[in-house]
C-alpha cells in the first residue's frame, strides 16, 4: 500500500451551484457548445478559446478537482475523469488548492 500526495481543490468552492451550472449548460448547448469538451465543468459557460483551456481531473465522487495525472482510479471514491474548465474557474481552483493524501491500495 502506498500513499499519494496530490494537490486538490474542493468542488463546492470552485463550481457554481447545480441549478446555475445546469442553466448555463443548457444555454451553452443551445449555442452549439458540447458538454465535456467546450463547456466549463465548473460553471457550465462556453469555453471560447479551447487552445488556452485547462483540464482538471474530477475525483472522490465529484468532491475534488486535481491536476494530478497518476493512478487516481485506485484511490477511495470514484474517478470521474478529465474535464475542461474555463480561465475564471481555473483561477478559483488555484486559489482554493490544498494538498491531501490518498491511499493507493496497489
Task: Report residues per predicted region.
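Short recognition patches in nucleic-acid-associated and regulatory proteins
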Residues: 2-17, 21-25, 33-78
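Intrinsic disorder/low-complexity signal
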Residues: 9, 29, 104-105
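Short, compact, well-ordered microdomains
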Residues: 69, 73-106
Amino acid at each position: 500500500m502506498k500513499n499519494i500526495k496530490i494537490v486538490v481543490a474542493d468542488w463546492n468552492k470552485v463550481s457554481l451551484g447545480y441549478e446555475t451550472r445546469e442553466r448555463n449548460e443548457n444555454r451553452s448547448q443551445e449555442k452549439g457548445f458540447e458538454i465535456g469538451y467546450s463547456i466549463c465543468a465548473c460553471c457550465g459557460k462556453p469555453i471560447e478559446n479551447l487552445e488556452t483551456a485547462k483540464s482538471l481531473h474530477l475525483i472522490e465522487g465529484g468532491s475534488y478537482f486535481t491536476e494530478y495525472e497518476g493512478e487516481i482510479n485506485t484511490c477511495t471514491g470514484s474517478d470521474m475523469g478529465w474535464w475542461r474548465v474555463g480561465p475564471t474557474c481555473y483561477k478559483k481552483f488555484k486559489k482554493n488548492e490544498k494538498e491531501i493524501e490518498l491511499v493507493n491500495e496497489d
